UniProtKB/Swiss-Prot annotation:
Subcellular location: Secreted
Domain BPTI/Kunitz inhibitor intervals: 7-57
Name of the protein: Kunitz-type serine protease inhibitor conotoxin Cal9.1d
Tissue: Expressed by the venom duct.
InterPro entries, A to Z: Kunitz_BPTI, Kunitz_BPTI_sf, TFPI/VKTCI-like
Entry note about domains: The cysteine framework is IX (C-C-C-C-C-C).
Source taxon at top rank: Eukaryota
GO terms, molecular function: serine-type endopeptidase inhibitor activity; toxin activity
Family the UniProt entry places it in: Belongs to the venom Kunitz-type family.
Record site feature (Reactive bond for chymotrypsin), residues: F17, A18
Organism name: Californiconus californicus (California cone)
Amino acid sequence: RTKRDVCELPFEEGPCFAAIRVYAYNAKTGDCEQLTYGGCEGNGNRFATLEDCDNACARY
C-alpha cells in the first residue's frame, strides 16, 4: 500500500478495549483527528502522534 492508500482508509477502532489515543486521517475533512483505538486489529490509518499523521497524510 502507498501512503495515499493508507490515508484513504476509514479509521477502524478494532474489537479490543485498550482505549489508546491515536490520530487518524479523515479523507472527508482533509484533517488528522484524535480518536480512540482498542489496541488490536484495525488498519494502517493510525498514528501515534498528530505530527506523524500530518507527515504521512495531510500533505500527500
